Amino acid sequence: MRILEPFREGKLVATGKVPSVVSIEMAQECARQCVLNGLAVVAAECGGTLTQVSRIVRLGVFVACDDGFSEQPKVANGASDLLQQIFGEAGRHARAAIGTNALPLNACVEVEMMVELL
């Protein structure tokens, strides 16, 4: 299991709270970037390929958000939809989408991903 922030080219894609600073659409993009970063780690550990991925077991998507914001599942869909596009049925997974007051480095999204390998 890995905890992933939305880094691209060494920088966070977006920082701040959803939706006052970061739009839902940008937060979805950040969730997708977290997944891509996680899959890069998996591929690096598996000889540069994802062929050993049996299935995606679980995602935990944490959203730094304003009080009263209740659309965390919509943000998490950015990550879930990407995994299903990549892996098909094996990309279906259990998921938690949780709102929080703050995340490390002021990230707007953080993803925890559990992958089962062959």
Say what each PLM segment does.
Residues M1-L118:
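Short, polar/acidic, helix-capping and beta-turn segments at strand->helix junctions
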